[in-house]
Structures are given as C-alpha cells and as structure tokens.
Amino acid sequence: MLIDIIRAVILGIVEGVTEFLPVSSTGHLLLAERFFNLGEGNFWKSFAVLIQLGAILAILALYFVKLWRIALGMFTDANARRFVIGVLVAFLPAAVIGAAFGGYIKHYLFNPWVVCFSLIVGGAILLWVDQLDLKPRYHDATAFPLLTYFYIGCAQCTAMIPGVSRSGASIVAAMLLGTDKRSAAEFSFFLAIPTMLGAFVYDLYKNHADMTADNLIIVAIGFVVSFITAIIVVKTFLTYVTRHGFELFAWWRVIVGTLGLIALALGL
C-alpha cells in the first residue's frame, strides 16, 4: 500500500506539472511507466486518466469568477454565448476523432518510441513558432473568431498521438492564427475542460469495475496532488510565457525526447 501511495504522489505531481504545459502529460506519464516502473497494469493506466479530474478542477478554481459570469450570461450576453459555442466548436473535432479512432491510437501508438519522437518534433515546431515575428490580432481568449476556435480544435486532434501535447498543439495553432501567447495559453486551459472531462467520464465508465476501496484511496491521493500541483503550475506558467515565451518548454521536450531515445536504444 505504501508503494502504491508513493506511486500515486509521483504520478500526481507529473500530471499536475505537465498537463497544462506544452510538454505532453501523457507522454511523460508513459515514460515514467517505462523507465521507472511506475503505473504498470490496467488500474494504473486508468489512474493516469482519472487524476486528470484534479487538473480540470484546478482550472475551474482559478477561473471560477470568469467562467461563472460566462455561464450566467450565456442566454443574455452575445459575447458569452459566442465563447461557449466557440469552446464546443473547438471540442467537437477531438470528440469525433477520439470516438472513431481512440482505440486504434491507444493500441498502436501508445509506446515510448512514439512519445520520444513526438516530443522532439513537437519541441522543434514550438521553438520555431515561438521565434517567429508574429503580429497578434487577438488578445482575449474569450473573443476569438469562431473559425479560429474550430481550427484550434482541429490542431488539438494531433495530440491524440502521445508526446504531441494537447496544450502544445492548441497553443501553436492559436499563435499561428493570430493570438498572443497569453491568450493562446489561456484558451488551451479552457479547451481542456470539456476535452479532459470527456476522457475522464469515458475511462471511468469503461473501468469502474477496477475501482476497489483501496484503489479509490489511491486515486483520491493522486487527484489531490494533481490539483494542488496544477494550481501552482498554471499561475506560474502564464506569468512566465507572457514575459519569456515558450523556448524553455521547447528545449525541455527536445532534451527529454532525445534522452528517452538514447535510453531505449541502449535497452534501458
């Protein structure tokens, strides 16, 4: 039980730190499982999805006032209504692709080699976009054009490949479509709510039989750790990228992916 608690804490930290950074939480969790023997077995694979609820609630807590105002104004405020529609439009491509190909993707692509290559390629793309002399036209994540929301949602679908990063894909697309860095990051947070909630509900439905009393305690520990870590990371991340951009995270991806490939090639 103690070993399981330690695993839950470590994986909760990994989830909370990486979920909203453009570095791929799924990729990092898969690498943690492969190289440190963390999270082997069906329960632990479900655990990695279930503790995402902690990260989702972190966003709801941080943006509660803004999201509550939008919810209240959905039927009276055209801007609030447009934003809600925009989030749904952005979420739709991932919902369709996930339902159609999710099982295939998990079966064939969820392995450390794919993760490492995706980390490196995604890091190179993030570094390239971060250094472009882009002229932002949109500075409010709740006021993008509807077509922009849709294109961001399409880009997010690439993150079904482990190692790509859901937030990274949506941030890169948003910046190329004319948003500034802060609003690109913020919208990736908002888009995470329906996307991750959908994955959470689906996985809970499929694997509820594995949820024994002991397992629920382990999930609860991972959930709390993920929530607290995500709160700290999101607040720090927004301040950092506004001032410094995404270069640090791009290099992080490249270094982790390269070290992972070396370790795999050596049979570690």
UniProtKB/Swiss-Prot annotation:
One of its GO terms (biological process) is cell wall organization. It comes from the Bacteria. It is found in: Cell inner membrane. The chain crosses the membrane at residues 47-67, 83-103, 109-129, 144-164, 184-204, 217-237, 248-268. The keyword Signal does not apply. It is an enzyme of class 3 (hydrolase). Its main location: membrane. Keywords: Antibiotic resistance, Cell inner membrane, Cell membrane, Cell shape, Cell wall biogenesis/degradation, Hydrolase, Membrane, Peptidoglycan synthesis, Transmembrane, Transmembrane helix. The keyword Chloroplast does not apply. It catalyses: di-trans,octa-cis-undecaprenyl diphosphate + H2O = di-trans,octa-cis-undecaprenyl phosphate + phosphate + H(+). GO terms for cellular component: plasma membrane. It is a multi-pass membrane protein. Pfam families: BacA. Its EC number is 3.6.1.27. Catalyzes the dephosphorylation of undecaprenyl diphosphate (UPP). Confers resistance to bacitracin. PANTHER family: UNDECAPRENYL-DIPHOSPHATASE (PTHR30622:SF3). NCBIfam families: PRK00281.1-2, PRK00281.1-4, undec_PP_bacA. Belongs to the UppP family. Bacitracin is thought to be involved in the inhibition of peptidoglycan synthesis by sequestering undecaprenyl diphosphate, thereby reducing the pool of lipid carrier available. This is Undecaprenyl-diphosphatase. It comes from Rhodopseudomonas palustris (strain TIE-1).
